[in-house]
Amino acid sequence: MTDQSKGDGDKPLYCTFCGKSQHEVKKLIAGPSVFICDECVELCNDILKEEIHQLSPVPDQDELPVPKAIRKHLDDYVIGQDRAKKVLSVAVYNHYKRLRGSAKQEVELGKSNILLIGPTGSGKTFLAETLARYLDVPFTMADATTLTEAGYVGEDVENIIQKLLQKCDYDVEKAERGIVYIDEIDKISRKSDNPSITRDVSGEGVQQALLKLIEGTVASVPPQGGRKHPQQEFLQVDTSKILFICGGAFAGLNKVIEQRLSTGTGIGFGAEVKSKTQSEEGAIIAKVEPEDLVRYGLIPEFIGRLPVVATLDELDEEALIEILREPKNALTKQYSALFEMEDVELEFREDALRAIAKKAMARKTGARGLRSIVEGVLLGTMYELPSIEGVAKVVVDESVIAGESDPILIYANQQKNKQASGE
């Protein structure tokens, strides 16, 4: 087809579909004995887009992975946290099953938003990201500490939906099938059990602002970002279809739970004194009840909007070593792939992996701190390696992690000599 701007001689050309002349439209495209204008092309595009959305607003029943399949995928990327993975798999499956059946069901199904409780670096954010990637739905993260009530300086809670829309090019239907992860949710807890008479811009007030968004409302979002103003056209997003996952470390929550559990167990010389070895912190956190979260500082209405609670354990040394080498995207595999691009083999010895895990434990950063340790150890080598010829292998051992030596470089001729000598 060709772009026609003029007819033969002075005779004007007309769009075969709408009848407009070439002078009334921007472009007129010619085919064999027919013409179509740019306006009709745009209209056809809109019709096709609408048709596609109607055909597949939510994946078919066969396409929605069952809880066991979701759990299996999480196992490929996340080490440990078995109960949390089970809880998440069921909650996510039920959420998308609810979206599919909402029109057919006589009984209205409630939302199953999720609260993840676990120490820093235990995998809360990574679990949410992995789920969204597996389900192929839009995903965005927000930091609860940056949120404020409407009218105050800071981020409105509706900015969360704005970010989700940005992730899917402002496709409202796609956004309504998305997952939102709100981190540091424990940081907006009320500082005491008694409601404050002063305004709490980033605490209880934000909880109140998040209530409707998480439960389900039609949020009016400006498409171009920024604060709302009357001249803007708003996009209407139904948040009842969006899955919200909130996460936080909840430091000190174990003491609140212990206090509840110890009530009525007796005091004085005959009372049993529980040591830390008898009741580990992870086991205590797993016994969390809504009343504990209220005492911690979350308002009851907000807790009610997060009916599914999953607790994550603090990662021990063995778990960190597994994280370094077992998952599909394990750090050692990632760095090995980088070195392979230079035709160099990278080897982490067992004592090196243990030393990295111990370092992360000492820093109390969990899995989150592993990458910075490995990056720091390999930085010098990655800087020099592209300029050095003949390197076949790089070996990292315990002394390298301790900073006592540099990674060992083995050259191609050294390897040949070793192989020839039978070593």
Swiss-Prot record:
Keyword Metal-binding: yes
Signal peptide: none
Any GO BP: proteolysis involved in protein catabolic process
A molecular-function term among this protein's GO annotations: ATP binding
Keyword Cell membrane found: no
Record-linked Pfam families: AAA_2, ClpB_D2-small, zf-C4_ClpX
SMART domains: AAA (SM00382), ClpB_D2-small (SM01086), zf-C4_ClpX (SM00994)
Gene3D superfamilies xref list: 1.10.8.60, ClpX chaperone, C4-type zinc finger domain, P-loop containing nucleotide triphosphate hydrolases
One cellular component term from this protein's GO annotations in UniProt: HslUV protease complex
Residue intervals of the ClpX-type ZB domain: 3-56
Residues noted as binding Zn(2+) in the record, renumbered to the chain: C15, C18, C37, C40
Record keywords: ATP-binding, Chaperone, Metal-binding, Nucleotide-binding, Zinc
Subunit and interaction comment: Component of the ClpX-ClpP complex. Forms a hexameric ring that, in the presence of ATP, binds to fourteen ClpP subunits assembled into a disk-like structure with a central cavity, resembling the structure of eukaryotic proteasomes.
Function in brief: ATP-dependent specificity component of the Clp protease. It directs the protease to specific substrates. Can perform chaperone functions in the absence of ClpP.
Name used for this protein in its record: ATP-dependent Clp protease ATP-binding subunit ClpX
Organism whose genome encodes this protein: Idiomarina loihiensis (strain ATCC BAA-735 / DSM 15497 / L2-TR)
